[in-house]
Amino acid sequence: MTNSKILICDDEEGVRESLKLILGDHYNLITVDSGEMALKALSNCKDVQIVLLDIKMPKTNGLDVLQEIKMKSPHLKIIMVTGYKSVETAAEAARLDASGYIVKPFKSQEILDTVKKNLES
């Protein structure tokens, strides 16, 4: 699994750095700070297996990015990592076929377990 490639998309540098610390020893990581950059990275890198995607970002809503990614790559695993705790937002992410939903602040083990589970499924 250490060769698995994960795209991290979050506008907060601290969150990106935390995820890099948690996942960097286990996976190959690409980090971007916007939905637009995530879409660009995915078009340039076809071997990404999982996307960790924030919802609230400047310019682009993560749910819109999720929907656009799923139209192009329906089998790509996308895990939402967000500060939104609402059932409605989680339900919308599930409806759009998100593979997981993690609320910030997150625990390292929660990230590792969710990524591992998605890689194995």
For each feature predicted by the language model, list its residue ranges.
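Acidic catalytic/metal-coordinating carboxylates
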Residues: 34-37, 61-64
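Charged docking surfaces used in two-component/phosphorelay signaling
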Residues: 17-24, 113
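Active-site beta3 strand of CheY-like receiver
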Residues: 46-52
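Receiver (REC) domain active-site loop signature in two-component systems and cognate sites
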Residues: 57
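C-terminal output helix
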Residues: 106-115
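Short hydrophobic/Thr-rich beta-strand motif most characteristic of the beta2 strand and flanking loop
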Residues: 27-33, 41
